[in-house]
Amino acid sequence: VAVFSDELRDGLCGPVGDKHKGAFLAGIPGEEMSVKFGIAGAIEHPQVHCDSVNYTKKPWAKQPVQMISYVSCHDGLCLVDRLKASMPSITPEQLIRLDKLAQTVVFTSQGIPFIYAGEEIMRDKQGIDNSYKSPDAVNAIDWRRKTTNGDVFIYYKRLIDLRKSHPAFRMGDAAPVSYTHLRAHETL
């Protein structure tokens, strides 16, 4: 059984309840410990001080595979819409770079990576939050984006390949993550 890490999602993107407020991806300081918590897989780690993590004050996973690493899902804004809402003046180039950065964190974190359908081609839902009652024009995946955003698609594919090829990104046991193999730079 695994749990979605809202700590990582909101540490990167901003609080789900305030779509206009950014966080780490927007260059706003204060959520670095939540990002570290997610990278470590929601387990106890000597460089994670849970008193500074959003939503939790102690590790809630015993093993990193009990945490799902993600930045968006069907509830709430998709990643592209979230970045646009929290950074209204974002350029298309910045959007692509931050999208790639967000997924780099997801795929190089301990835990189980999760991507929302269409994120690999920069899907948007026209800024509609929680679109379960919206029409297909909002919810359908526009596969033409695979052509226009082919470089992003290839980037995601390479992240998946990297994760599969290197066991450091998928350690199932907490001990090597906490005490041997995972160290964060002190400025993060």
Kindly give the residue locations of the regions a language model identified.
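Extended hydrophobic/aromatic segments used for targeting, binding, or gating
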Residues: 125-149, 153
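Charged, low-complexity surface segments at secondary-structure and domain boundaries
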Residues: 83-89, 137-147, 176
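Conserved alpha/beta catalytic core and glycan-binding cleft of carbohydrate-active enzymes
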Residues: 1-117, 121-122, 132, 167
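Catalytic cores of secreted or luminal carbohydrate-active enzymes
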Residues: 148-171
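Short, glycine/acidic-rich hinge or "gate" loops at secondary-structure transitions
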Residues: 118, 172-173
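A glycine-rich phosphate-binding loop feature that marks nucleotide/adenosyl-phosphate handling sites
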Residues: 121-124, 175-179
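Single conserved hydrophobic/aromatic residue that forms the stacking wall/gate
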Residues: 181-188
